[in-house]
C-alpha cells in the first residue's frame, strides 16, 4: 500500500476532532442516556436488549460504504456529501424525539432507534473513510488516539450532559440539545473542503465481489474477519450491563451518567495519549497482546461486583472505570490496524467493512449479555465474559502473524 499523502491541515484536524466527537456523542446518547432513561422508566433487561440489537444496524455501514465507492465524487466531495445527508437525517430524528414522549410509545421508540442507528452508520462510514484519505500512515496511530479521545468526549456530551438535561428540564431539552449539535456540525461541513482522492471503479457486481475478496488477501484472510468480530466482544459483553447493573445497585440516572459518561471519559482522556505514544514507538503486535492482557484480571474482578458493593458502594464504579481504561488503551491500536489494511482508493469500503465486523461482534455480545444476565444473573454472565476473553486471547496468539504483515506492507 502506498503512502503518498500529504500531512493534514488544520481544517482537516478540526473536522476529524469535531466530527468524531459528534459521532460518539450519538453513541453516548444511544447506549448511555437512552438506556438509562428507559431503565428508569421500568424497562426490563430483555426490552433493553432490543436497543442493543437495533444498534447493530450500524454494522451495515459497509453497505453504505459500497454506495460511497460506487458514486463518483460530486460537488460536495467524495465523503462530505454523505456527512451532510446523514447529519440532516439525524436532525430530523432528534426533532421527532423532541416532539414526542418516546418512553410511552415502544413502537415509536424502536422506529427512532432504527433511524438513529442507520443515519449514524452513514455518518460513521463517511468519517472513517475521510480519515483514511486524510491521514498518512505515520499519523494513523495518532489519528486513532484522536478518535478514541473524541469517543470519550462524545460520551460525556451524549451521556452525562444529555442525562443532566433530561433530569433537570425534560426530554424536549435533551433532544433539542442534540438537534442543536447536529445543526452546528452541518455548519462546519458547509465550510469544509475535502481533499481529492481516487475512487474505486467498476460495477456493483465488482464491488459485491470485493466484499468477499477483501477477506481472501494475504494481508487479511478469513482469520482477520474472525479476529475483528471477536476482539472487542469481551469488553462489549461486560459494558452492555453497566447501565442496568448500576441502576440495580441503587445509582440514579444522573449518577449513572456521571460514572459512565464523565468518570470513564475523563480517566480515559488522561491515559489515551499514552496509547498514542505506544503506537508510534512500539510494534503493533506487541501492543495488541500487552494491552489485551490488561482486560483479563479486570473482567474477572467483575464477577465479585456484588461483594465489593457491600464493602463500599463506589467500588463497582471503580471496577467499571478500570475495565474501560484497559479497553481505551487497546482501541487506538485496533483502529490503526484497520487503517493499515485499507487501500486508499477504497478507503471507505475497506475500513467500514472491517469496523462493521467489530461493531457486529460488539452489539451481538451486548445483546447476549443482557439476555444472559436476565436468565442466569449478572455474576454468571460476567464469568461468561471471562471465558470469552480467554478464548479471544488464544485466537489472537494463534494469528499473531497478521499483525506483522500490516506493519511491513503499509510503510
Regions found by a protein language model. Give the residues of each.
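C-terminal ends and interior cores of transmembrane alpha-helices
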Residues: 84-103, 294-311
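Intracellular juxtamembrane helix-capping segments at the cytosolic ends
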Residues: 34, 121-135, 328-343
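A late C-terminal transmembrane helix in Major Facilitator Superfamily
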Residues: 345-376
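Helix-to-loop junctions at the C-terminal end of transmembrane segments
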Residues: 61-77, 270-284, 373-374
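Juxtamembrane intracellular "pre-TM" segments in multi-pass secondary transporters
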Residues: 2-9, 194-225
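C-terminal transmembrane helical hairpin of 12-TM major facilitator-type secondary transporters
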Residues: 286-334
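Helix-loop boundary and gating motifs at the non-cytosolic
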Residues: 2-58, 222-227, 231-246
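Glycine-rich segments within core transmembrane alpha-helices of 12-TM secondary carriers
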Residues: 61, 141-166, 355-366
Amino acid at each position: 500500500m502506498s503512502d503518498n499523502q500529504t500531512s493534514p491541515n488544520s481544517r482537516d484536524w478540526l473536522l476529524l476532532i469535531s466530527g468524531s466527537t459528534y459521532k460518539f456523542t450519538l453513541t453516548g446518547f444511544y447506549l448511555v442516556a437512552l438506556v438509562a432513561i428507559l431503565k428508569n422508566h421500568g424497562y426490563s433487561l430483555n426490552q433493553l436488549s432490543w436497543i442493543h440489537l437495533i444498534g447493530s444496524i450500524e454494522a451495515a455501514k459497509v453497505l453504505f460504504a459500497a454506495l460511497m465507492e460506487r458514486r463518483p465524487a460530486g460537488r460536495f466531495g467524495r465523503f462530505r456529501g454523505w456527512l451532510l445527508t446523514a447529519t440532516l437525517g439525524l436532525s430530523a430524528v432528534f426533532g421527532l424525539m423532541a416532539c414526542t414522549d418516546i418512553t410511552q410509545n415502544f413502537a415509536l421508540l424502536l422506529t427512532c432507534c432504527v433511524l438513529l442507528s442507520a443515519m449514524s452508520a452513514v455518518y460513521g462510514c463517511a468519517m472513517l473513510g475521510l480519515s483514511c484519505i486524510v491521514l498518512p500512515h505515520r499519523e494513523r496511530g495518532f489519528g486513532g488516539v484522536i478518535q478514541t479521545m473524541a469517543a470519550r468526549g462524545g460520551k460525556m456530551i451524549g451521556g452525562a450532559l444529555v442525562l443532566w438535561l433530561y433530569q433537570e428540564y425534560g426530554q424536549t431539552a435533551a433532544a433539542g440539545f442534540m438537534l442543536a449539535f447536529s445543526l452546528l456540525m452541518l455548519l462546519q461541513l458547509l465550510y469544509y473542503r475535502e481533499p481529492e482522492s481516487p475512487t474505486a471503479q467498476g460495477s456493483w457486481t465488482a464491488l459485491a465481489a470485493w466484499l468477499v475478496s477483501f477477506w481472501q488477501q494475504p494481508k487479511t484472510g478469513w482469520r482477520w474477519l474472525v479476529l475483528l468480530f471477536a476482539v472487542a466482544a469481551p469488553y462489549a459483553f461486560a459494558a452492555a450491563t453497566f447501565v442496568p447493573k448500576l441502576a440495580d445497585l441503587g445509582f440514579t440516572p444522573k449518577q449513572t451518567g456521571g460514572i459512565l459518561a464523565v468518570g470513564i471519559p475523563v480517566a480515559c482522556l488522561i491515559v489515551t495519549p499514552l496509547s498514542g505514544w505506544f503506537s508510534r514507538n512500539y510494534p503493533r503486535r506487541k501492543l495488541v497482546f500487552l494491552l489485551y492482557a490488561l482486560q483479563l484480571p479486570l473482567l474477572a474482578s467483575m464477577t465479585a461486583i456484588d461483594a465489593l458493593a457491600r464493602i463500599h458502594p463506589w467500588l463497582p464504579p471503580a471496577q467499571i472505570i478500570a475495565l474501560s481504561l484497559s479497553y481505551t488503551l487497546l482501541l487506538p491500536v485496533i483502529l490503526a490496524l484497520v487503517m493499515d489494511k485499507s487501500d486508499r482508493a477504497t478507503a471507505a469500503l475497506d475500513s467500514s467493512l472491517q469496523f462493521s465486523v467489530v461493531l457486529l461482534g460488539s452489539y451481538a455480545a451486548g445483546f447476549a449479555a443482557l439476555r444472559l444476565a436476565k436468565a442466569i444473573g449478572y455474576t454468571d454472565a460476567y464469568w461468561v465474559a471471562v471465558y470469552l476473553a480467554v478464548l479471544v486471547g488464544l485466537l489472537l496468539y494463534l494469528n499473531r502473524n497478521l499483525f506483522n504483515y500490516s506493519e511491513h506492507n503499509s510503510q
